[in-house]
């Protein structure tokens, strides 16, 4: 079937030599005047059987010579002149009677064309193509003749072979004018015309020839190509063969026929003769040309011998290719003829024939007939069945071998599919059934499956269209999931375990890799239009597939598509990924990895076989056959290639790696970016309003959500998700590394932190990761940050710096809580973190204002320790304890750096000075050069001084906390922003504490202690009375400056903290003459002694002061700053010393010559000297170089080897007293000026306080060395500044004694230091340095120091929602902006409240109440109060001072405005007063009084005006204290029995969640916070939304402020719906206020309710902890109590409304009461008549009227809409409009109703005005099915019900009037046997009971006004209505309610 003969036409003419040929008719004229064309298909058996070698050589030479033009045209014909030597089989001959014409013949495999004209001349042309025998050729000859204008012609001869133009040669066309007499094809000319070869033997043709086309003119290359392409089997569609091709049944043949018909239409005019073999009949073949079919006079060709047509391809008609398939099947089932395997040898034999048979079929189907037959007989399905049988049978019989290892079968199948060229649909079907169906091949060996997939990869380049049409991507993905699984699924086929063997995981993964390569090639070869669909398939696959190996590889495939070199395609795939839901898919994958990663091991187990292989077995069947596996391993087919594939086992983190790589690629390519700006902290504003405020799109939100989900996934499962591979990938994506497979090359300088979003995820995840990973990450990031300044800058400029690294440090310390020792590696990690921070901050130390970075680092640590995190208990304590430890080590490291750097800068500046001096510059230029060189030193010194102040801040704070450590914290609250210095402001002495310590502690924190009784007794006269002058002095002494205001100016830390407080109180009173000792008693100092001092210090494990290493480092830094190597003082050029080489640095001099830096350095030096003196040898400087090992870190020493070396160098300098002299040198050397008085006065006060506390109370020097060090400079200052200080008269005591005026031994030149110190211990000296001038100067300096320590806190910013790891507090935001802020104290806060405003507040209210009834008789407005009674009645109205008549809503608004403008009323003054009171009134909220017991409606004073508000605001108004803390924190009184355990007082945050407070007039968004003691609602000011700027007339302040409720105030909880979602809770308090909160979803509501219940509110009854209405109703026995008449009808209905979810707070679901009565027409209403009651069994209300109900049913049945479902009622029985219809007359519903009606009341039906008419409308109107809604059923009891004038709808109507039914006017209601209406919950039926009581009748009136007259409104508002008795309420409550409306 694959022979050469089969490639030609199916039918052909056979020429068998001289006895055969075609003889054609002649023509009366020469038909080829313009040229000719000849075309045919020919198969030549032999060219020259007798041709010798010489003849062949001559022919080849002749052809070559003819091509080169070196031989004449006649030469080829004269090659041989011998007789019978030339064999030239003719192709055709066209001759005239005189032998003129054209001939073509073969000469030794070359085609020769000869032409002859008159006079015997002839020419010939040899073509160079060598034809081969026994091969089919399409030969076309075309001779053109183009006649010129002048008779010249341009002729050429063309040769076509197989449709292509092979050769074109110039050849003159003969001019022939004679008729055509002889036409011969394949035979000799007749004897009468021997032709052009007369001298040679006539040679016939031995060949087969297809159809013969003779054209009478050239047809051109294009037509010749089409003629060759359609083949020789096509019969033209004209002549006798017309219509035959249309018998085709497949598309291919039909398309070919259509194309052929078009070609025939073009060729029909050119053709001269056409004879087709299929038309042969006997010895004659008719002419099939157009002229022959038309009946032209032509004689058909006749054969000179028997000629017959042959058909070589007999398959389409005799056996078909499918007949070979039975040879591949050994046996079949007899019942269904399905193949089966019974005999192994026969099966193997038939299998060996499979590949050759498939190849034979591939050749056979090339023929159109076979192709059509294969389609008709469903060949692809049959082939697939046979192939599956072959593979399964062989696999079942060949277990011990490599299953199916014959790759020839794969090649045969591939050849079969590729051989199909003419029928594309059949090819697609073959691909689907044979190649793409992995089920057939799944039983094969790994090698054979890989061969198949590799073949498919190669076929993508040639068969992409067929594979695309076969939907190869989806088919392969489905097969991948079903057959290449690692986790068993329901739909997966376990074909790998037919023999019980296990699969190799590596082989499965390798096959998946090969399969995805096919998909990648298909996607790359497709047009961009297919990208979206292909990616959608991939995304759907990874969403649904639980196979982690497949998901990871598909993600890697997407990554390769996005980062491919072709930028256009990469862009297309990236955009398609995003638009096809790629971001959402990644979100799902992240969530799945968090939830299911730990469950993967439950589905399969990995078993090591022989120590090297990993296989997969189903759970519960892990047993492996050792023999089978041994055979598999030792099999010959198991090559090293298989072994390498088995090592292709995934890590468990490959999915996360794929996600991160894909996200990183999309970010790096610019596809995932924010349009709202480059913010690194994208997660902090994720769920907030940042995106909306900054114009963010939904795409920005999705990108941020993706990054947020990735972060939360790492935090939720760090050990499983944050692995080494994931970390490397994430860090590589952050720096945009090209590849991270082999790790990151940190030496590559091209790495930059280009993607801060990904870096932020990594940094925020590190606190949750393992310590090993933390160490690695810190080292890597530090290395990257240090390799380039840009990296360091980008890292430090992140908003999260340094929060993430501090959180690592603090969280690790927190995790070690409760452990005996630190975790392994904690010390190393802590060292690494501190080194990281110090290296980063060292760079800031060299920059201007670099101290801001240090300050921000410390503030961040403070925020993290006290606010950050969510830990409680011991872990929270550990977290707070880490702050001082961190500060010590950080500040100590920076001080070490500063000391060493200052030394280095000294040498730099000195070298620069020497260089400028050597250049002989002018002094001015040299000075400028030195200052420029010293600029870095200026920045360094500035930052160093700030560090010193931070150290002092730390020491002062720790001292205060240590002093208060033994006290009890009464009520700490997380809502307080005050951390330093009043962290524990409320202190009480603990049990067992000494009175001395207790009093000292109390004196530190407060100055409220009075004068001792002994002092008062000493100041009394003989009669025991205290004179007025003495009392004035006592009062003045009590008003002296408290210690808190001056403490920061002293050295108020260390061992003398308590002594300083006591001394100041005592000495400040001495100046007023209070507490003067008697003359006989000894006047001593303030030192409390060594025991007290040691007790005041916080000790480490070795018993040393824990702050001592930090003090030592501060001293070392000051020595490097102020002293030179010789130890001489006078740094900065002061005092003659060179200092650190800073001569000429005026900037540094001015820097340090300011109050705050100077005094800070002085206090630190004094501290070091004081703590050095322990009554023995010096402790501070003795072992400075070797005693640096005191614990200063969390788990490791504070110092390191570098600091020890620095300390060793600095210890060579002189004693610390030299440092004190250097610090005080500016004061000693500066000119005496009054401008420096404050600094000098503060310096002397500080020095004297140290002298005072170094002397004991019995006047003994306790610290002699300290006194010897500080007295000389102290005395020197006093001597120098004595003239100025003596001029301060206020320094004198009450007796007029100024110690600086008189001569004293203390200032004597020969006085020893101890002697001088003891001389200063006197009342005069003590009082002088605590006098008012001294106190004022100290207070100003202390304000500056305290301002640095504890700046004023602004209002806390709104917290970012949905961030559980943060609280409502944000970091300390007030920072010093410039260094100059140290040089002046902070300004005191302004108190805008006048001094007497507190007293005037109440007076304004009372005077307003008195004046108002006299001056404002009109325009009184009211609004409904939210206070409820015990039965939930809202029966109180309160004045609405900001109310309005809403005149703008009326039609005659212009006229009323004119009248109002011309109305003279003396109310202007009152309006001003009311405006002032308005603020006071509206400051109050809904929770008026926190009464828990009693009726809130009953008040003692009936004339007392109720003002809405809260006690917090009342206290604020009356006291003028601007404290934003809740009332519970300011003035909370607790029962002493409740304070049982101090740990219970520790308040912590339990839950924070975004929520919305729903109010009738507005919706306020904020954060709902639950702590262990409170429920807080913090308003988000930016999100605050109100329905109107004026709620009921004004903007209510209580809607905007934060709220806080104690847990003890909670009484009930109910679940609610809001906006048709079950997402809300309503809280009912013990004070009968209620609040409605919406949490957005059911989960949020559930979490909030659970958190509240778990907090165990004491007054929350157990029955209300369950929020299901049925449970609450059953537990409370609501219906039973109503049936027993224990509760009224109203209370029962309100309880039902409450349980049903109706609330006063939501206007869309307001409480409703049903209509009860149905008779509103009768004059007398008989309550005993059942017909007067509504039938409550017919619900809803639309079913009451049968006629209307029938209309509703007809409407329902006839309604047809494709979108809207059928419905009965077009409105709801209780909507917002229906509620406001009834309640529009009372605020705040008036305002709401106006807003709903578009601010116009212009229709009469907009407001409820007639009871009877309303009932009629409810009963008959098709659009009215309203039930009754009410503000409160007992509102009729309040006389002033509504506003005087609301609006007017009609000129003659009054909207304040409501018409009542006529039976309401009767004087008597006979109720002898009347029955009261009661409701039963079960069937809503009415039951009656006898009533024997009489009821007073109402006053008759036709219409009853619901509002009182304007004249007596105020009087009636204070009148309490008469209440009915209990029995009367039970009987007629419902009726009274209906009648009152």
Swiss-Prot record:
Classification via CDD domains: Beach, PH_BEACH
Gene Ontology cellular-component terms listed: plasmodesma
Compositionally biased tracts (Low complexity): 1874-1897
InterPro entries on file: BEACH_dom, BEACH_dom_sf, BEACH_Domain, ConA-like_dom_sf, NBEA/BDCP_DUF4704, PH-BEACH_dom, PH-like_dom_sf
Outcome of mutating residue 1616 to E: Loss of interaction with GFS12
Composition bias, Basic and acidic residues: 1496-1510
Cysteine pairs bridged by disulfides in the record: none
Disruption phenotype: No visible phenotype.
Compositionally biased tracts (Polar residues): 1829-1848, 1856-1871, 1898-1920
The BEACH domain, residue ranges: 1667-1941
Region Disordered: start-end pairs: 1481-1513, 1829-1923
Alphabetized Pfam families for the sequence: Beach (PF02138), DUF4704 (PF15787), PH_BEACH (PF14844)
Source superkingdom: Eukaryota
Domain BEACH-type PH stretches: 1544-1653
SMART domains the UniProt entry points to: Beach (SM01026)
Biased composition (Acidic residues): 1481-1492
UniProt cross-references to PANTHER family, sorted A to Z: BEACH DOMAIN-CONTAINING PROTEIN C2 (PTHR13743:SF157), BEIGE/BEACH-RELATED (PTHR13743)
Function statement: May act as a negative factor in protein storage vacuole (PSV) trafficking regulation and plant effector triggered immunity (ETI). Negatively regulated upon interaction with GSF12, and also probably by BCHB. Required for ETI, but not for cell death.
Oligomer status and interactors: Interacts (via BEACH-type PH domain) with GFS12 (via protein kinase 2 domain).
Domain notes: The BEACH-type PH domain (1556-1653) is required for interaction with GFS12.
Protein name in the entry: BEACH domain-containing protein C1
Gene behind this protein: BCHC1
């Amino acid at each position: 079937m694959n022979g050469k003969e089969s490639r030609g036409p199916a039918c052909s003419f056979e020429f068998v030599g001289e006895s055969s040929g075609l003889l054609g008719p002649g023509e009366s004229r020469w038909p080829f005047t313009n040229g000719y064309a000849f075309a045919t298909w020919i198969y030549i058996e032999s060219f020259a059987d007798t041709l010798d070698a010489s003849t062949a050589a001559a022919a080849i030479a002749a052809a070559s010579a003819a091509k080169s033009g070196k031989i004449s045209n006649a030469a080829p014909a004269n090659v041989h002149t011998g007789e019978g030597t030339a064999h030239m089989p003719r192709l055709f001959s066209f001759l005239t009677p005189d032998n003129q014409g054209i001939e073509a013949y073969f000469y030794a495999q070359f085609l020769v064309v000869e032409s002859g004209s008159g006079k015997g001349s002839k020419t010939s042309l040899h073509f160079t193509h060598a034809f081969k025998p026994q091969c089919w050729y399409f030969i076309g000859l075309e001779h053109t003749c183009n006649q010129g204008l002048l008779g010249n012609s341009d002729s050429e001869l063309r040769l076509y072979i197989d449709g292509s133009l092979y050769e074109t040669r110039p050849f003159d066309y003969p001019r022939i004018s004679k008729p055509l007499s002889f036409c011969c094809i394949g035979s000799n000319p007749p004897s009468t015309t021997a032709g052009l070869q007369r001298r040679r033997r006539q040679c016939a043709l031995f060949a087969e020839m297809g159809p013969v086309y003779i054209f009478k003119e050239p047809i051109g290359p294009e037509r010749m190509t089409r003629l060759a392409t359609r083949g020789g089997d096509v019969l033209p569609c004209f002549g006798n063969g017309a219509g035959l091709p249309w018998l085709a049944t497949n598309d291919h043949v039909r398309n070919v026929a259509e194309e052929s018909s078009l070609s025939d239409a073009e060729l029909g005019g050119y053709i001269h003769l056409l004879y087709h073999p299929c038309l042969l009949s006997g010895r004659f073949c008719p002419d099939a040309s157009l002229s022959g079919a038309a009946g032209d006079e032509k004689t058909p060709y006749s054969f000179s011998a028997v000629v017959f047509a042959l058909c070589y391809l007999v398959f389409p008609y005799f056996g078909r290719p499918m007949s070979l398939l039975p040879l591949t099947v050994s046996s079949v089932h007899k019942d269904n003829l399905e193949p089966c395997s019974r005999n192994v040898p026969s099966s193997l034999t038939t299998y060996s024939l499979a590949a050759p048979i498939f190849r034979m079929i591939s050749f056979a189907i090339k023929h159109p007939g076979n192709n059509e037959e294969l389609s008709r007989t469903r060949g692809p399905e049959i082939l697939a069945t046979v192939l599956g049988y072959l593979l399964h049978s062989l696999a079942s019989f060949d277990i011990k071998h490599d299953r199916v290892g014959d790759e020839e079968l794969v090649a045969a199948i591939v050849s079969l599919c590729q051989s199909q060229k003419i029928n594309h649909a059949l090819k697609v079907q073959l691909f689907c059934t044979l190649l793409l169906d992995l089920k057939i091949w799944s039983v094969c060996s790994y090698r054979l499956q890989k061969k198949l997939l590799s073949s498919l990869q190669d076929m993508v380049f040639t068969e992409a269209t067929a594979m695309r049409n076969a939907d190869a991507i989806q088919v392969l993905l489905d097969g991948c999931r079903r057959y290449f699984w690692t986790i068993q699924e329901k739909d997966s086929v376990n074909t790998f375990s037919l023999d019980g063997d296990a699969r190799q995981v590596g082989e499965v993964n390798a096959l998946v890799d090969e399969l995805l390569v096919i998909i990648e090639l298909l996607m790359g070869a497709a047009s961009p239009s297919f990208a979206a669909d292909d990616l959608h398939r991939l995304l759907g696959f990874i969403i649904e597939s639980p196979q982690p190996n497949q998901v990871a590889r598909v993600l890697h495939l997407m990554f390769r598509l996005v980062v491919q070199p072709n930028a256009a395609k990469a862009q297309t795939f990236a955009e398609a990924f995003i638009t096809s839901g790629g971001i959402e898919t990644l979100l799902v994958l992240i969530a799945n990895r968090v939830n299911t990663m730990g469950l993967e091991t439950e589905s399969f187990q990995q078993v090591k076989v022989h120590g090297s292989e990993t296989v997969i077995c189903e759970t519960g069947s892990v047993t492996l056959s050792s023999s089978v596996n041994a055979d598999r391993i030792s099999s010959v087919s198991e090559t090293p290639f298989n072994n390498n594939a088995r090592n292709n086992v995934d890590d468990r983190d490959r999915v996360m790696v794929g996600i991160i790589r894909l996200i990183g690629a999309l970010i790096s390519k610019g596809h995932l970016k924010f349009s709202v700006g480059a913010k690194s902290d994208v997660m902090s504003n994720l769920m907030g309003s940042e995106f909306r405020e900054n114009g963010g799109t939904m795409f920005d939100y999705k990108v941020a959500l993706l990054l947020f989900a990735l972060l939360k996934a790492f935090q939720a499962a760090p050990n499983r998700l944050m692995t080494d591979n994931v970390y490397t990938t994430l860090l590589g994506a952050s720096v945009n590394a090209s590849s991270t497979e082999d790790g990151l090359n940190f030496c590559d300088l091209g790495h930059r932190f280009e993607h801060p979003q990904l870096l932020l995820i990594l940094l925020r995840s590190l606190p949750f990761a393992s310590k090993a990973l933390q160490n690695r990450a810190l080292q890597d990031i530090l290395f990257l940050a240090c390799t380039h300044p840009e990296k360091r800058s980008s890292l430090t400029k992140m908003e999260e710096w340094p929060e993430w690294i501090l959180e690592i440090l603090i969280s690790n310390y927190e995790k070690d809580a409760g452990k005996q020792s630190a975790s392994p590696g904690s010390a190393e990690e802590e060292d690494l973190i501190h080194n990281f921070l110090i290296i980063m901050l060292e760079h800031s130390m060299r920059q201007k204002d670099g101290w801001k970075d240090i300050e921000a680092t410390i503030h961040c640590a403070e925020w993290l320790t006290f606010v950050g995190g969510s830990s409680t208990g011991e872990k929270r304590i550990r977290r707070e304890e880490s702050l001082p430890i961190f500060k010590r080590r950080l500040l100590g490291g920076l001080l070490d750096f500063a000391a060493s750097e200052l030394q280095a800068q000294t040498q730099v500046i000195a070298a620069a000075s020497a260089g400028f001096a050597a250049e002989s510059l002018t002094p001015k230029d040299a000075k400028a050069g030195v200052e420029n060189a010293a600029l870095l030193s200026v920045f360094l010194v500035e930052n160093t001084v700030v560090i010193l102040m931070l150290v002092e801040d730390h020491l002062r704070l720790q001292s205060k906390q240590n002093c208060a450590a033994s006290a009890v914290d009464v009520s700490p609250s997380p809502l307080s922003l005050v951390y330093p210095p009043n962290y524990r402001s409320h202190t009480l002495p603990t049990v067992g504490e000494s009175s001395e310590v207790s009093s000292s502690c109390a004196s530190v924190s407060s100055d409220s202690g009075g004068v001792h009784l002994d002092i008062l007794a000493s100041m009394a006269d003989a009669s025991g009375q205290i004179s007025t002058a003495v009392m004035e002095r006592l009062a003045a002494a009590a008003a002296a400056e408290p210690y808190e205001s001056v403490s920061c100016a002293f050295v108020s830390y260390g061992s003398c903290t308590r002594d300083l407080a006591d001394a100041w109180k005592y000495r400040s009173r001495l100046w007023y003459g209070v507490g003067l000792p008697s003359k006989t008693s000894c006047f001593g100092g303030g030192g409390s002694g060594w025991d007290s001092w040691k007790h005041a210090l916080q000790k480490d494990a070795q018993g040393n002061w824990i702050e001592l290493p930090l003090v030592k480092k501060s001293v070392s830094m000051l020595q490097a700053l102020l002293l030179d190597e010789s130890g001489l003082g006078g740094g900065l050029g002061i005092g003659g010393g060179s200092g650190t080489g800073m001569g000429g640095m005026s900037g540094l001099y001015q820097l340090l010559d300011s109050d705050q830096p100077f005094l800070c350095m002085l206090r630190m030096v004094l501290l070091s000297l004081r703590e050095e003196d322990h009554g023995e040898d010096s402790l501070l400087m003795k072992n400075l170089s070797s005693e640096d090992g005191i614990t200063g870190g969390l788990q490791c020493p504070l110092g390191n080897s570098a600091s020890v070396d620095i300390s060793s160098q600095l210890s060579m300098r002189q004693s610390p007293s030299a440092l004190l002299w250097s610090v005080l040198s500016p004061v000693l050397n500066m000119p005496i000026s009054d401008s420096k008085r404050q600094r000098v006065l503060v310096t002397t006060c500080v020095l004297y306080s140290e002298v005072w506390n170094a002397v004991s109370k019995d006047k003994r020097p306790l610290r002699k060395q300290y006194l010897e060090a500080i007295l000389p400079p102290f005395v020197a200052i006093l001597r120098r500044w004595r003239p100025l200080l003596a001029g301060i008269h206020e320094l004198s005591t009450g007796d007029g004694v100024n110690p600086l005026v008189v001569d004293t031994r203390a200032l004597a030149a020969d006085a020893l230091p101890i002697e001088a110190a003891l001389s200063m211990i006197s009342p005069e000296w003590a009082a002088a340095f605590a006098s008012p001038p001294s106190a004022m100067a100290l207070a100003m300096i202390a304000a500056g120091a305290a301002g640095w320590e504890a700046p004023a806190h602004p209002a806390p910013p709104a917290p970012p929602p949905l961030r559980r790891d943060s609280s409502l507090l944000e970091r300390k935001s007030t920072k010093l902006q410039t260094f100059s802020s140290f040089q002046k104290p902070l300004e005191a806060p302004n108190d805008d409240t006048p001094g007497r405003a507190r007293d005037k507040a109440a007076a304004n209210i009372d005077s307003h109440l008195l004046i108002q009834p006299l001056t404002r008789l009109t325009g009184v407005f009211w609004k409904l109060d939210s206070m409820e009674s015990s039965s939930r009645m809202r029966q109180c109205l309160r004045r609405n001072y900001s109310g309005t008549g809403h005149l703008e809503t009326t039609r005659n608004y212009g006229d009323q405005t004119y009248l109002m403008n011309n109305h003279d009323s003396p109310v202007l003054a009152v309006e001003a007063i009311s405006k002032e009171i308005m603020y006071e009134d509206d400051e109050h909220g809904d929770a008026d009084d926190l009464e828990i017991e009693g009726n809130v409606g009953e008040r003692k004073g009936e004339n007392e005006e109720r003002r809405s508000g809260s006690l917090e605001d009342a206290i604020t108004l009356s006291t003028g204290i601007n404290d934003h803390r809740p009332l519970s924190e300011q003035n909370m009184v607790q029962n002493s029995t409740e304070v049982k355990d101090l740990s219970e007082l520790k308040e912590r945050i339990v839950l924070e969640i975004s929520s919305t407070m729903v109010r009738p007039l507005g919706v306020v968004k904020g954060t709902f916070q639950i702590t262990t003691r409170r429920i807080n609602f913090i308003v988000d000011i930016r999100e605050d939304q109100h329905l109107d700027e004026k709620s009921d007339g004004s903007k209510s302040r209580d809607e905007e402020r934060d709220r806080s409720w104690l847990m003890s105030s909670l009484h009930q909880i109910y679940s609610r719906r809001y906006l048709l979602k079950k997402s809300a809770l309503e809280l009912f308090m013990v004070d009968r206020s209620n609040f409605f909160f919406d949490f957005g979803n059911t989960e949020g509501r559930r979490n909030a309710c659970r958190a509240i219940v778990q907090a165990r509110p004491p007054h929350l009854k157990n029955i209300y902890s369950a929020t299901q209405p049925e449970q609450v109703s059953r537990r409370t026995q609501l219906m039973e109590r109503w049936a027993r008449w224990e509760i009224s009808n109203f209370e029962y209905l309100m309880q039902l409304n409450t349980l049903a979810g109706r609330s006063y707070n939501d206007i869309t679901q307001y409480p409703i009461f049903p209509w009860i009565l149905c008779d509103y027409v009768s004059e007398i209403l008989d309550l005993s008549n059942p017909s007067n009651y509504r039938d409550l069994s017919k619900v809803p209300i639309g079913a009451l009227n049968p006629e209307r109900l029938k209309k509703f049913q007809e409407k329902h049945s006839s309604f047809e809409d494709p979108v809207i479902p059928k419905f009965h009622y077009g409105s709801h029985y209780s909507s917002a409009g229906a509620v406001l219809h009834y309640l529009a007359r009372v605020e705040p519903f008036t305002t709401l109703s106006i807003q709903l009606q578009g601010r116009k009341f212009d229709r009469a039906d907009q407001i409820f005005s007639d009871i009877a008419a309303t009932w009629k409308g409810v009963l008959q109107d098709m659009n009215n099915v309203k039930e009754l809604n009410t503000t409160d059923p007992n509102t009729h009891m309040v006389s002033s019900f509504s506003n005087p004038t609301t609006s007017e709808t009609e000129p003659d109507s009054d909207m304040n009037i409501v018409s009542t039914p006529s039976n309401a006017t009767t004087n008597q209601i006979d109720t002898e046997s009347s029955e009261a209406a009661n409701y039963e919950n079960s069937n809503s039926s009415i039951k009656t009971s006898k009533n024997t009581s009489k009821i007073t009748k109402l006053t008759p009136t036709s219409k009853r006004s619901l509002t009182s007259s304007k004249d007596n409104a105020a009087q009636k508002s204070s009148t309490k209505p008469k209440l009915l008795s209990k029995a009367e309420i039970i009987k007629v409550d419902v009726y009274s309610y209906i009648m009152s409306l």
